[in-house]
Structures are given as structure tokens and as C-alpha cells.
Amino acid sequence: MSRVNAVRIHRNGGPEELRHEEIEIGDPGPGEARVQHTAIGLNFTDIHHRTGRYPLPQFPHVIGMEAAGVVEAVGAGVSEVRPGDRVAYASDRPRAYSQATVMPITRLVKLPDFIDDETAAAVILKGLTAQYLIRAAHPVSAGETILIQAAAGGVGLIMCQWARHLGARRAHRDLEARRTVGSSILLP
């Protein structure tokens, strides 16, 4: 067991419900790693958990869905990561607003040297969402025209850039902001 600082809520509400507290986290079990956070992503999902729009199973609860950091320890049988590895994750449940957490290794992505921890923590959840939409929900191909309706947010911006890289034409409604990410068609 380790004691770490965390930000938790004891009930739903505004930002005044965020409390800085010390909590205990366990040791990693089979298929898990303990990650010491170096950067934490902030998302609308976190606000929705805090306000109660996305209910939490119980209180008090740590919120936060994405972070980056360094593996501190691994559970039995874990060979995919080892202590000292830099990783990022998009969590299966809120737990990122803390100094460290225990995470299933299936959620961890090793970070290459050219991606810093702050960038990884800020983009992984949005990037995985964009990846799902562009690769799984509808595989986008060169020459195809796609409409990105909400291109001003994190997911939309990543989708614009990714679609451009794939050679697809992008149509957007947010004229000025979309010019900066290479939109091919701008809708008034």
C-alpha cells in the first residue's frame, strides 16, 4: 500500500466540491501496474463526473480519465511494461487526479521519446476517440469527403488533421478555426 495525494469529490456539484486529500492505493496485482503521474489530462468528462451528469458508483471518488507518468511497479506476470517505462492511459473509470494509480496494463500505452508527458496526458483520450471514429466506425480513405460537425474541440481538431493526413477532404462549419488545420471545404 502507498499513500498519495489526490483530488476527490464527496458529492456532486461545482468546483468547490474538489478536495485535496491523501488516499491509499494498493499494490499492482496480476495484469496491473502502478503509475506515478507526471501529467494529468483535463476533460469535459471530468466535469460531468463532478456535476453528476455521469454518475459515479460511490463517494468519495477520485475523478479524471487520462494521465501520463512512469511505471513504479508491476504485478505478477506483467512483461509488457516494467518499472521506469514512460506510459499514458485513457482509464476505464475515473482515477487520474492523483499522484499515482494502479492501472490494468491493457490501458497503458508506452510513450516514444518524441512525445512529452504533458502532450500525451492532454491528447490520449481525445486521440483514441478520433482513432475509433476514423479507423473503426468508418475507415476514412484518400479522396473521400467527410463532415466533421464539431471540429472546434479536441476530438474534432485531431480528426481534421488525421483526415488531412489520410488524403480525405474535410468539411467544417467553424470557418476561421478550421482554416488553421487545413480544411478543404468550409461551410457557412
Predicted regions: what they are:
Residues 1-4, 168-188:
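C-terminal hydrophobic helical "lid"/dimerization subdomain
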Residues 4, 85, 143-145:
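Nucleotide donor/acceptor-binding cores
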Residues 24-41, 51-95:
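Glycine-rich beta-strand-centered segment in the early N-terminal region that forms part
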Residues 89-150:
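NAD(P)H dinucleotide-binding glycine-rich loop of Rossmann-like/cofactor-binding domains
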Residues 148, 164-170:
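Adenosine-nucleotide cofactor-binding segment
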Residues 152, 160:
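N-terminal Rossmann NAD(P)H-binding glycine-rich loop of SDR-like oxidoreductase domains
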Residues 155:
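Hydrophobic/small residue at the entry helix of a nucleotide-binding pocket
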